[in-house]
Amino acid sequence: IGTVSRGVRAPIIKSGDDIVEIVVNSVLEASADDGFKFHDRDIVAMTEAVVARAQGNYASVDDIAQDVKAKFGGETVGVIFPILSRNRFAICLRGIAKGAKKVVLMLSYPSDEVGNHLISIDALDEKGIDPYKDVLSLEKYRELFGYEKHTFTGVDYVEYYESLIRESGAEAEIIFANDAR
Protein backbone atom coordinates (compact mmCIF):
# COMPACT_ATOMS: atom_id res chain seq x y z
CA ILE A 1 0.00 0.00 0.00
CA GLY A 2 2.80 2.42 0.81
CA THR A 3 2.78 5.01 3.53
CA VAL A 4 -0.33 5.27 5.68
CA SER A 5 -0.85 8.03 8.20
CA ARG A 6 -3.50 7.82 10.91
CA GLY A 7 -4.64 10.16 13.60
CA VAL A 8 -5.17 8.20 16.80
CA ARG A 9 -7.32 9.41 19.68
CA ALA A 10 -5.58 9.41 23.03
CA PRO A 11 -6.34 10.81 26.45
CA ILE A 12 -5.34 14.39 27.25
CA ILE A 13 -1.64 14.27 28.10
CA LYS A 14 -0.51 15.96 31.32
CA SER A 15 2.89 16.54 32.85
CA GLY A 16 4.19 13.32 34.39
CA ASP A 17 2.00 10.99 32.32
CA ASP A 18 3.58 7.73 31.09
CA ILE A 19 3.69 8.60 27.40
CA VAL A 20 4.91 5.12 26.37
CA GLU A 21 1.97 3.39 28.05
CA ILE A 22 -0.53 5.91 26.67
CA VAL A 23 0.78 5.62 23.09
CA VAL A 24 0.94 1.81 23.15
CA ASN A 25 -2.57 1.48 24.57
CA SER A 26 -3.98 4.12 22.20
CA VAL A 27 -2.58 2.58 19.00
CA LEU A 28 -3.50 -0.97 20.04
CA GLU A 29 -7.06 0.17 20.79
CA ALA A 30 -7.22 1.98 17.43
CA SER A 31 -5.90 -1.15 15.70
CA ALA A 32 -8.60 -3.31 17.30
CA ASP A 33 -11.38 -0.78 16.62
CA ASP A 34 -10.41 0.00 13.02
CA GLY A 35 -9.20 -3.44 11.93
CA PHE A 36 -5.63 -2.66 10.92
CA LYS A 37 -2.53 -4.65 11.92
CA PHE A 38 1.00 -3.71 12.78
CA HIS A 39 3.85 -5.25 10.79
CA ASP A 40 7.59 -5.56 11.27
CA ARG A 41 9.26 -2.18 10.65
CA ASP A 42 6.06 -0.15 11.06
CA ILE A 43 6.73 3.19 12.69
CA VAL A 44 4.59 4.90 15.30
CA ALA A 45 5.29 8.61 15.72
CA MET A 46 3.80 11.41 17.76
CA THR A 47 4.15 15.15 17.69
CA GLU A 48 6.87 16.67 19.83
CA ALA A 49 4.23 18.76 21.61
CA VAL A 50 2.79 15.58 23.15
CA VAL A 51 6.22 14.49 24.38
CA ALA A 52 6.97 17.96 25.76
CA ARG A 53 3.66 18.05 27.60
CA ALA A 54 4.31 14.65 29.22
CA GLN A 55 7.79 15.83 30.23
CA GLY A 56 6.52 19.18 31.53
CA ASN A 57 8.95 20.73 29.05
CA TYR A 58 7.19 23.81 27.71
CA ALA A 59 7.15 27.53 28.33
CA SER A 60 4.15 29.12 29.98
CA VAL A 61 2.79 32.54 29.01
CA ASP A 62 4.49 33.95 32.13
CA ASP A 63 7.81 32.29 31.20
CA ILE A 64 7.66 33.89 27.76
CA ALA A 65 6.73 37.29 29.26
CA GLN A 66 9.67 37.21 31.68
CA ASP A 67 12.05 36.25 28.89
CA VAL A 68 10.80 39.01 26.58
CA LYS A 69 11.07 41.58 29.37
CA ALA A 70 14.60 40.45 30.30
CA LYS A 71 15.89 40.38 26.72
CA PHE A 72 14.11 43.40 25.24
CA GLY A 73 13.58 45.67 28.24
CA GLY A 74 9.79 45.48 28.22
CA GLU A 75 9.40 48.26 25.66
CA THR A 76 8.44 47.80 21.97
CA VAL A 77 8.78 44.36 20.40
CA GLY A 78 8.27 43.50 16.74
CA VAL A 79 6.86 40.17 15.56
CA ILE A 80 7.25 39.47 11.86
CA PHE A 81 5.25 37.07 9.68
CA PRO A 82 3.68 34.66 12.17
CA ILE A 83 1.64 31.71 10.95
CA LEU A 84 -2.07 32.28 11.58
CA SER A 85 -2.92 29.96 14.45
CA ARG A 86 -5.23 30.11 17.45
CA ASN A 87 -3.18 27.52 19.28
CA ARG A 88 0.59 27.66 18.98
CA PHE A 89 1.22 31.27 18.00
CA ALA A 90 -1.58 32.76 20.11
CA ILE A 91 0.00 31.44 23.31
CA CYS A 92 3.39 32.85 22.33
CA LEU A 93 1.81 36.19 21.37
CA ARG A 94 0.15 36.45 24.79
CA GLY A 95 3.52 35.98 26.46
CA ILE A 96 5.26 38.45 24.15
CA ALA A 97 2.57 41.08 24.76
CA LYS A 98 2.61 40.50 28.50
CA GLY A 99 6.36 41.23 28.49
CA ALA A 100 6.21 44.43 26.41
CA LYS A 101 4.54 47.83 26.43
CA LYS A 102 3.90 47.70 22.68
CA VAL A 103 3.82 44.94 20.07
CA VAL A 104 4.24 45.76 16.39
CA LEU A 105 2.81 42.78 14.52
CA MET A 106 3.67 42.50 10.82
CA LEU A 107 1.38 40.11 8.98
CA SER A 108 2.11 38.91 5.46
CA TYR A 109 -0.82 39.17 3.09
CA PRO A 110 -2.93 37.94 1.37
CA SER A 111 -1.80 34.77 3.23
CA ASP A 112 0.81 33.48 5.65
CA GLU A 113 3.65 31.20 4.51
CA VAL A 114 1.56 28.04 4.81
CA GLY A 115 -1.36 29.42 2.79
CA ASN A 116 -3.78 30.60 5.49
CA HIS A 117 -5.53 33.55 3.84
CA LEU A 118 -6.37 36.84 5.52
CA ILE A 119 -7.99 38.10 2.32
CA SER A 120 -8.55 36.76 -1.17
CA ILE A 121 -6.36 37.55 -4.14
CA ASP A 122 -9.52 38.71 -5.92
CA ALA A 123 -10.12 41.30 -3.18
CA LEU A 124 -6.57 42.61 -3.67
CA ASP A 125 -7.14 42.90 -7.42
CA GLU A 126 -10.48 44.67 -6.93
CA LYS A 127 -8.83 47.28 -4.69
CA GLY A 128 -5.70 47.63 -6.84
CA ILE A 129 -3.39 46.55 -4.02
CA ASP A 130 0.02 45.04 -4.77
CA PRO A 131 1.02 42.88 -1.78
CA TYR A 132 4.66 42.95 -2.89
CA LYS A 133 4.84 46.76 -2.76
CA ASP A 134 2.00 48.10 -0.64
CA VAL A 135 2.37 48.35 3.14
CA LEU A 136 -0.96 48.76 4.91
CA SER A 137 -1.77 50.03 8.37
CA LEU A 138 -4.57 48.36 10.29
CA GLU A 139 -6.81 51.32 9.54
CA LYS A 140 -6.14 51.13 5.79
CA TYR A 141 -6.59 47.35 5.81
CA ARG A 142 -10.00 47.70 7.52
CA GLU A 143 -11.03 50.51 5.16
CA LEU A 144 -10.21 48.36 2.13
CA PHE A 145 -11.20 44.87 3.28
CA GLY A 146 -13.34 45.23 6.39
CA TYR A 147 -13.51 42.31 8.81
CA GLU A 148 -12.58 39.11 6.99
CA LYS A 149 -13.03 35.73 8.67
CA HIS A 150 -10.88 32.72 7.84
CA THR A 151 -12.74 30.31 5.54
CA PHE A 152 -12.36 27.25 7.75
CA THR A 153 -12.00 28.56 11.30
CA GLY A 154 -14.42 31.49 11.08
CA VAL A 155 -11.89 33.63 12.95
CA ASP A 156 -10.87 37.18 12.03
CA TYR A 157 -7.19 36.63 12.91
CA VAL A 158 -6.41 40.34 12.74
CA GLU A 159 -9.06 41.15 15.33
CA TYR A 160 -8.11 38.08 17.38
CA TYR A 161 -4.40 38.96 17.54
CA GLU A 162 -5.11 42.62 18.27
CA SER A 163 -7.39 41.64 21.17
CA LEU A 164 -4.80 39.16 22.55
CA ILE A 165 -2.16 41.89 22.59
CA ARG A 166 -4.43 44.45 24.25
CA GLU A 167 -5.83 41.96 26.80
CA SER A 168 -2.24 41.13 27.76
CA GLY A 169 -1.65 44.79 28.61
CA ALA A 170 0.28 46.02 25.59
CA GLU A 171 -0.44 48.53 22.86
CA ALA A 172 -0.98 46.87 19.46
CA GLU A 173 0.20 48.14 16.08
CA ILE A 174 -0.58 45.87 13.15
CA ILE A 175 1.09 46.27 9.77
CA PHE A 176 0.43 44.30 6.58
CA ALA A 177 3.50 43.86 4.38
CA ASN A 178 5.61 41.23 2.65
CA ASP A 179 9.03 42.84 2.98
CA ALA A 180 10.44 43.01 6.49
CA ARG A 181 12.86 45.80 5.57
Residue ranges and their predicted role:
Residues I1-R181:
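N-terminal and secondary-structure boundary signal
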